[in-house]
Amino acid sequence: MKSENQPEDKRIGKLKREANMQKMKEAAEVEEKKKEENEALVGFFHSYQELFQFFCNNTTIHGAIRLVCSKKNRMKTAFWSILFFFTFGLMYWQFGIIYREYFSFPVNLNLNLNSDRFTFPAVTLCTLNPYRYSALQNELAELDHITQKTLMDLYKYDMSQGQNNRKAQLSRKRSYRSLHYHVSRHPLHRYKRDSQASIEDNNTQVDKNDWKIAFSVCNENNTDCFKQMYSSGVDAVREWYSFHYINILSRIPNAKSLDESDFASFIYACRFNEVTCDKANYTHFHHPIYGNCYTFNANSSNLWMSSLPGINNGLSLVVRTEQNDFIPLLSTVTGARVMVHNQNEPAFMDEGGFNVRPGIETSISMRKETTNRLGGTYSDCTEDGSDVPVKNLYTSRYTEQVCIRSCFQNSIVERCGCGHYFYPLPSGAVYCDYAKHKAWGYCYYKLLAEFKADLLGCFTKCRKPCKVTEYQLSAGYSRWPSTASEAWVFHILSRQNQYNITSKRNGVAKVNIFFEQWNHKSNGESPAFTVVTLLSQLGSQWSLWFGSSVLSVVELVELILDFIAITCILAIHWLNMNRSSDLPIPTSNTTDTFHNVLPPPNTLPRASVDPDVITLPSYKSLESLDLRRVSSQQTE
């Protein structure tokens, strides 16, 4: 029996040795794997807890280590957790305020005083008389006759001019029917002032028992009319007369040739910087309301330069202001109109100019002011108007008023089919004339109301230029010439200019335009919140709340990236687990076959095991041992 157990003991010893070797091999593999993990170029944490604990133990952000070092005291851990995340919230609230201020794009206004030579601005003077009445008398005779009758009906005023020669009467008879028809479609009426009228139409300074004046413009079928109301009869008559006047001008093909372009008949004397002006120093244009206009220093190739301030270092003009041959219903003001503007900019006399009084010396002192705005995201300005959706109808450079007037004229041409006589025409358009465009007045005045209410969007579309040069003006007045000197002054002027001044003091005026001081003001904008300022503010807040640096931010970014990586790894592992759970489960036939191969456990022979053996055989070795025993029993 003992001899039979010896081979069996040998087998068991061999199995023990094999089990020990297998265990040592597995331990070596585990150690090698740990070594490879420690020496790996890129390693990942096995759980979120491991990641968070590593971050708190090694980060340079203040307060993070207190989240793990006090984990044995849950109260402290909870306190530091609340404090840590509350501090984070406060810091990012401050970040939000800083970012909001940065993206509002604030600017700093820089004020500079420059003392250098000035470029003298352009100066425009107008006669305040559109045309010589004698040159247009034949064309205006019929309109004057209808106006005279209208004034008689409304105000019992006999407007007798004493200028009705035979030629004018024949002209009136030939064209009376055509003009009378159009005037009758746009009548001037007097209305009883309504107590329920709007405040604009019902001025509180005018008695309610008084009358208000209006003229009507109707559409082609006379089914709808627009009434242009005026509280002043003078304004109403002048506007009504001007409306018919521009219709007459649009019919005259050679209206521009009626201009009085003789410089000497309007400008008696011209001197700049105590040097006499010549013809190369001015340009001429005509305005349908303000008449002949002369612009000095408009030539950009030879501009006047002013080295010193003062009245003797500027422009001095003596102009004629008599009204012997003015159109009475248009020229209600005597004198001249002057405007100071930049070169290559149109002179809008109705907006930026002011009148010069006859018999008065007007001294205009100027202060130059330049404004440079930041474009792009800092302000809604334009560099040259190329990005403004309005076609420039003027030949000058872009200004806000050029854009607004071009926008209005384009709207008139689009809606009414013709252009207003006061503005330049787009290509292919014609000026409005109620002989050709019957209801253009109705269209124009309704469009004018929309324009003033900004329903056309012109004031919104037209942006301010980024660079603007303005001149602040202040005027002083004195009697000129004085009583003691007027005799010889008028005598010399009448002999020198070969013009007989009948009204004397009301026939001339003097204008002086000069710089008030040596320096001029320049306003510039600079960004108040740059990227450098933004980073400085963010760094200050980060250091205030956590006492950290840029590298601490990098650590936080690394934590976020590791968190994302672990999440991806766990997600992939979870998907693999779900796929392995979908494999087929072994059937009962397979189980029965397995049990048929192995005998019942009680039938196996028992082997004696030495008590000094600590390591147990592996499952595979025992399985092979059982199979051998079964085969030996079957052999026996």
UniProtKB/Swiss-Prot annotation:
Pfam families: ASC. InterPro entries: ENaC, ENaC_chordates, ENaC_CS. Signal peptide: none annotated. It is found in: Apical cell membrane; Cell projection, Cilium; Cytoplasmic granule; Cytoplasm. It is a multi-pass membrane protein. It comes from the Eukaryota. Residues 99-549 are extracellular. Heterotrimer; containing an alpha/SCNN1A, a beta/SCNN1B and a gamma/SCNN1G subunit. This is Epithelial sodium channel subunit alpha. It comes from Anolis carolinensis (Green anole). The gene is SCNN1A.
